[in-house]
């Protein structure tokens, strides 16, 4: 039983980002347009034991606005925080 979903429509109501070139839409877009590169020497830990010491790290990330309490932030791993913050930002951007 195959479903053809090509006739389904999607409405994008808001955008949210957490990236190496910006953690909010304005910063992200300005850095993207300016050709800013998010790849740099790894600063979040000592990478000298690894073959590669460069990466696209998310810097200056503060998940606080997207979480109800500091306890919830502590319970959530960093990468889930990125997703939750991006979804929260998209909701804020949507104006819903």
Predicted regions and their residues:
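Conserved "HGTGT" condensation-loop signature of ketosynthase/thiolase-family condensing enzymes
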Residues: 1-96
